[in-house]
């Protein structure tokens, strides 16, 4: 059996699942705004780490392709590079205070190692408590019968953390969760 080796910044903090920790940038309650489940109440868990660099979202088609940019040493789009040059990642204390960008990956603080310190590192129990605290009625099925979905997003939510997802989904406080979407 060959085990996939991930860059250290994306690997779980500990491979012993009883003490392993999940790195995530944020969790929040909102209404799903994309895909088949538009309009459904949802809790989003945005994990840290991504093996892609989607620099060209929102840019004109005349912009050089990502591979061309990387060959010439460009690893961030201009907006992210501008933030790094301004050293905002060193002077801002909270993930929530980082500016929204309009080109490239909009979750830059969830993918680039330079922003890793903004992310939480939590046990499965701690993540579950955080998710439950975000539910309007503290449970995955509301009193009116409406299910609240869990949206696993990122970064790339299927990168290294999947070993912890079984423990997360089998947690006793997650037993009423019926719908999970992975945004990759």
Model regions: which residues?
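Conserved N-terminal beta1-alpha1 strand-loop-helix module at the mouth
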Residues: 38-43, 47-52, 128
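S-adenosyl-L-methionine
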Residues: 26, 32-38, 42
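Conserved Radical SAM active-site core
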Residues: 2-18, 22-25, 52, 56-184
């Amino acid at each position: 059996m060959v085990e996939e080796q991930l860059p250290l910044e994306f690997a779980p903090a500990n491979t012993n699942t009883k003490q392993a920790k999940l790195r995530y940038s944020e969790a929040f309650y909102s209404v799903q705004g994309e895909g088949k489940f538009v309009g459904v109440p949802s809790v989003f868990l945005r994990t840290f780490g991504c093996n892609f660099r989607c620099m060209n979202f929102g840019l004109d088609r005349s912009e050089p392709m990502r591979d061309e940019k990387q060959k010439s040493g460009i690893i961030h789009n201009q907006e992210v590079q501008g933030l790094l040059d301004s050293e905002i990642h060193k002077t801002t204390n909270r993930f929530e205070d980082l500016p929204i960008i309009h080109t490239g990956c909009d979750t830059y603080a969830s993918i680039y190692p330079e922003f890793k310190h903004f992310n939480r590192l939590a046990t499965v129990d701690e993540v579950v408590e955080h998710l439950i605290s975000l539910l309007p009625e503290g449970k995955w099925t509301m009193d009116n019968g409406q299910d609240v979905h869990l949206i696993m997003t990122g970064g790339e939510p299927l990168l290294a953390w999947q070993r912890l997802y079984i423990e997360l989904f089998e947690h006793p406080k997650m037993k009423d969760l019926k719908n999970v979407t992975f945004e990759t």
